[in-house]
Amino acid sequence: MQRTGLLLLLIASLVSPLLCSAEQGRVLKLDGNWKVEHVYVDEDSTSTNLMALISDDPTLRGRIFEFTPDKIKTSIPTASRCELPDYVSMDVTSINSLMSGTTEVQLSDPAKSYALPVKGTLDIRPYRIHCQNGAISPSDEHSEHWLVKLDEESIFLNWDNQSYLLLKKLADNATLQPSFACARATSDSEKTICHDSDLSSWDVSVAEAYNVALKQIVNTGVDVKSRSVELRKTQKRWLDERNACFVNPACLKKKMQDRVDELVELAKQ
């Protein structure tokens, strides 16, 4: 009987953490799709690592995170897939204290430096994310990832290159719209984009990246007219190339992802 009791205690000690972790996932109510609403970076930092991303970077903004009990999957091209995620409750702390552990440079007020929509003194309970298999992001093996449920519709998550993401909950069966009016779509490529939420989100990202690149040209004040004209010409040529994909979703997605990368790099100059 004594041995049986010890065996049961041993089993309970092994199973209990798993049950607690699963319970944390249910308490957090993460199941469903979440859209990257904002990308926060410290634009004043001189760190070359931070130049990998820009504020509200179109490569990340608009992407989808899918949370289920079995996985965390995202449409971010370079991201991995986190299988059997555990959410480990951390001590209550302030936003600033939490961010200080994941920023390269010590900032007096990280929330302010990153222009977050909340005060750095806000007390929150973060949850450390542990993937039993796989990873959330490309650098997951080198950094710790956590999330904060700001409210029922908002998640604050640390990401790569010392960036932070604000995720917004999507309604069940929500469909994403492209940057153009689908009612006026004429080409095969536009019609294909209109019928695919992922392609639609990338179309929006192309439009946002184009506007960011154009704004950067204007902000430099150097050869604004000629460079703006050249940007419009290259965008027109790219649209012709995109339309050559016709109804091929993989081709359309690749074209749009590559164009977003090109425009974001231009915006960094």
Regions found by a protein language model. Give the residues of each.
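Positively charged n-region of N-terminal signal peptides that target proteins for export
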Residues: 1-7
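Bacterial N-terminal signal peptides
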Residues: 7-17
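A short tyrosine-centered beta-strand micro-motif
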Residues: 33-35
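Short, exposed beta-strand/loop patches in secreted or surface proteins that constitute
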Residues: 63-66, 145-150
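N-terminal alpha-helical modules
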Residues: 23-24, 29-30, 39, 45, ...
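Short, conserved, GDST-rich strand-edge loop motifs in beta-rich repeat architectures
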Residues: 44-51
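Contiguous, well-ordered beta-strand patches that form the walls/edges
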Residues: 40-43, 67-142, 229-232, 240, ...
